[in-house]
C-alpha cells in the first residue's frame, strides 16, 4: 500500500521526480522532496498541499553525503520514519569519447554513481533498524546495452544496475526485508537533454526524443506500482519506454 508511506525522492524538481511526487502524494504518501532548485521544489510542494497531499522539501546536492543524511533526518523528524527512497537524480551529457569532455565525465560519476551511493548510505541504517524499506533507483536503457555517445553515461547506469542487484541479493541474505527496484527508462520527455553540450550528440538525441518521447508520468506509474506491492514481494527491474521506439 502507498497510503501513509514516507517516501524520499531525489531529483524531484522536474521530470520523473516531479511526476512521481505528485502521483504518490495523490495516493496518500507523505513525500519528502530533494533537489538543488528549491524554487521548483517549493512550487511542487505548494501544488501538492493545495490538492490535499502531504509534502515537504529540502535543498539537496546528492554528491554531498551530509545533504543526503540531512534529508533522511528531515523525513524522520517530520514523519517518524522512512519507508521508501527513490534515487532519481541524474545527468546525461552524452558525447563521443574522442570529444574528451572529462569535466562532464566526472560530473556524471559524481551525480549518477556517487549520488546513488550517498543516498543508500544515508538511508540503509534506518531501513536495517526498521527491518523494512524500499530502495528504488532510476537507471536507463543505456544501462542495459551500449549506445554511441553514451560510453560514460551508460557506464554510470550500468553501475546502478549492478549495485542495485547486489543490494537486493545481500538484503535477502541478511533478511532485512529491504526491497529494491531499478527502472530503465528509454525516451522519456524530461530536462535531461538540456545537459548535453556536444552538438552532434544533442542533435541526435533531440531527433530521437522528438520522434518517440513520452511523458514522465509513465515512469511515475511504474514507481507507484512497485511501491504498492505487498511487503513480501520485490519486483526488481522495469524497462519502460515508447511502444514504437526500437531501443
Protein language model regions, located:
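Conserved glycine-rich cofactor-binding loop
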Residues: 13-14
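Conserved glycine-rich Rossmann-like NAD(P)H-binding loop of the short-chain dehydrogenase/reductase
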Residues: 27-44
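The beta1-alpha1 cofactor-binding region of Rossmann-like NAD(H)/NADP(H)-dependent oxidoreductases
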Residues: 38-39, 59-70, 102
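Substrate-binding pocket helix/loop in short-chain dehydrogenase/reductase
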Residues: 96-97, 104-107
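Active-site helix of classical SDR
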Residues: 120, 156
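Residue(s) in the substrate-gating loop at a strand-loop-helix junction
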Residues: 140
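C-terminal helical subdomain
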Residues: 178-183, 202-247
Amino acid at each position: 500500500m502507498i497510503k501513509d508511506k514516507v517516501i524520499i525522492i531525489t531529483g524531484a524538481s522536474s521530470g520523473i521526480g516531479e511526476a512521481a511526487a505528485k502521483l504518490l502524494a495523490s495516493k496518500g504518501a507523505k513525500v519528502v522532496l530533494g533537489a538543488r532548485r528549491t524554487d521548483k521544489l517549493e512550487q511542487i510542494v505548494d501544488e501538492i498541499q493545495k490538492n490535499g497531499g502531504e509534502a515537504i522539501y529540502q535543498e539537496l546536492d546528492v554528491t554531498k553525503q551530509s545533504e543526503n543524511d540531512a534529508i533522511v533526518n528531515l523525513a524522520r523528524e517530520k514523519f517518524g520514519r522512512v519507508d521508501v527512497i527513490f534515487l532519481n537524480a541524474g545527468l546525461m551529457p552524452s558525447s563521443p569519447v574522442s570529444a574528451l569532455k572529462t569535466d562532464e565525465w566526472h560530473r556524471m560519476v559524481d551525480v549518477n554513481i556517487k549520488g546513488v551511493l550517498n543516498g543508500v548510505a544515508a538511508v540503509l541504517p534506518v531501513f536495517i533498524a526498521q527491518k523494512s524499506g524500499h530502495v528504488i533507483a532510476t537507471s536507463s536503457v543505456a544501462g542495459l546495452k551500449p549506445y554511441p555517445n553514451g560510453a560514460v553515461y551508460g557506464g554510470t547506469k550500468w553501475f546502478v544496475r549492478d549495485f542495485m542487484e547486489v543490494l537486493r541479493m545481500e538484503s535477502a541474505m541478511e533478511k532485512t526485508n529491504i526491497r529494491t527496484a531499478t527502472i530503465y527508462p528509454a525516451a522519456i520527455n524530461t530536462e535531461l537533454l538540456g545537459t548535453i553540450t556536444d552538438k552532434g550528440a544533442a542533435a541526435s538525441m533531440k531527433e530521437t526524443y522528438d520522434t518517440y518521447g513520452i511523458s514522465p508520468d509513465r515512469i511515475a506509474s511504474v514507481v507507484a506500482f512497485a511501491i504498492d506491492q505487498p511487503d513480501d514481494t520485490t519486483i526488481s527491474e522495469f524497462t519502460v519506454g515508447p511502444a514504437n521506439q526500437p531501443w
